[in-house]
């Protein structure tokens, strides 16, 4: 049927997207954990987890074929529910990144300063990964970043931009 053709395609392409996200997250984590620890003065711990709607047991080492098989299986299990609601209930578009600070979900329990520190950590980590991949330093744009940072975090940010081109408003 037409639905099976679509499910095969979304499983194939979705598995590649998920695999690439998992691999990227593994690289990003290496930088993010270090930066977050430094920016918080060693007082806070950051954990990043890829929350997949396909399977809870995925990581960067999971083969893409296994992800694709899990995806197909999940689509088969959800087939009647998806037909009722008229949309896909699982896949890369439904996945999320869990940001955990000191053992608690950042979206619910982190202070504004911790959330801001996490956001800065992502920006700095992304810049480092881009530099490693492309060999070029990206331009970093930071809007209203200093207003919610304490003096220690402000100093850290300024001192750790290195030779990057940064615009702060």
PLM features: residue spans?
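Conserved NTPase motor "head" modules and their coupling/switch loops across ABC/AAA+ ATPases, GTPases
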Residues: 2-139, 148-152, 156-160, 165
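Walker B catalytic acidic pair
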Residues: 143-145
